[in-house]
Amino acid sequence: MQKRVRNRLITIIICFCSAALGISIVLYNLEKNIVFFLPPSKINEIEQGKELRVGGLVKIDSINKIAADKISFVITDNIRDLEILYQGVLPALFREGQGIIAIGQLSDGKFIARQLLAKHDENYRPPS
C-alpha cells in the first residue's frame, strides 16, 4: 500500500508542476499582447526612451496639424497633460474629447507615438 500511495503522490506532484509551468508560459507570452496603458499622471521622466502605452482623452482645441501626415495634440487624464507627436494615418474615430491609446516613447517631455488606437464605448457604430 505504501508504494501505491507514493506513486500516486508523485503523479499528482508532476501533474501540478506541469500545469503550473504551462500556465506560466501562457501568461508570459500574453503579457506582450495585452493592451494596458498608463495615464499621463503616471508617466515620469525616468521612463525616457522606454516603449510605453499612454492613454487619455484628447484635449479640446489641442489638435495641431504640422504637415499632411504629421500631427501634435495633447491628451489628459484631468490631472496632467501630455503632448503627443504622431506621424501617420489617424484612426477614423480620432477627434477631440475621444479616448486614445498611444504607443511610443517619451522624449524631452513629449511623447513620440508610432501607433494610435482610438477607444470607443460599448455603443460603437462604424462611421457611415
From Swiss-Prot:
GO MF assignments: heme binding; metal ion binding
Keyword Heme applies: yes
A Pfam family: CcmE
Cytoplasmic compartment segments: 1-8
Protein's membrane topology: Single-pass type II membrane protein
Periplasmic topology ranges: 30-128
Function: Heme chaperone required for the biogenesis of c-type cytochromes. Transiently binds heme delivered by CcmC and transfers the heme to apo-cytochromes in a process facilitated by CcmF and CcmH.
PANTHER family: CYTOCHROME C-TYPE BIOGENESIS PROTEIN CCME HOMOLOG, MITOCHONDRIAL
Name of this chain's protein: Cytochrome c-type biogenesis protein CcmE
Gene responsible for this protein: ccmE
